[in-house]
Amino acid sequence: MSSPGAGKTTTLTKTIDAMKHDFRIGVMEADIDSAVDADMTRQGLLELDTSDVDLAILENVGNLVCPAEFDTGAVKNAMILSVPEGDDKPLKYPLMFQVCQCLLINKIDVLPYFDFDLEECKKRVLKLNPDMKIIPISARTGEGMDEWIDWLKEETSSWNESNEKGVKE
């Protein structure tokens, strides 16, 4: 989940490229503007042939309000905040930061050119969600992407192992 222009598509493309040899990945575009949309997304996930997919990714169209308000059935939520958006997003959209488990702070390669305080942003996020995994990345240059991929692989493997045993998190 993220705002338009935060780097969802680039991050998603690089993520799939890095994981495609180890995991079978499905992607669903999800425009969550209402409970009806969330219900349709959840139904789509239920109808997905899970025997063919290890990881299903829901990519929202790009806003920080609606996706946080509705349960899509996602096991984990990750969001992308880009440096050009500003370090005050946690103050403006607290719910989004409360419902996610992982935050990618993207476009760190342009940090020197923006008034973005990375440490202050992290403090604001952790005040809202002390358990948030925060990973600074540049999807364009690849910086930080290994940490993101490792986290996602671990979470995916852990869930798949639990699911095979009939355990729901």
Task: List the predicted regions and their residue ranges.
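Nucleotide-state-sensitive switch-loop elements of NTP-binding domains
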Residues: 1, 6-73, 86-88, 97
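Canonical P-loop GTPase G-domain recognition
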Residues: 110-169
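Hydrophobic transmembrane alpha-helix bundles
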Residues: 35-36, 91-101, 150, 169
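Conserved beta-strand scaffold positions in the cores of enzyme catalytic domains, especially
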Residues: 27, 77, 134-136
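Residue-level signature of catalytic and energy-coupling elements of molecular machines
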Residues: 31, 59, 106, 121, ...
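Residues at alpha-helix caps and immediate loop-helix transition turns in enzyme cores, especially N-
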Residues: 11, 37, 89-92, 117, ...
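Conserved C-terminal guanine-recognition region of P-loop GTPase G domains, centered on the G4
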Residues: 64-76, 80-132
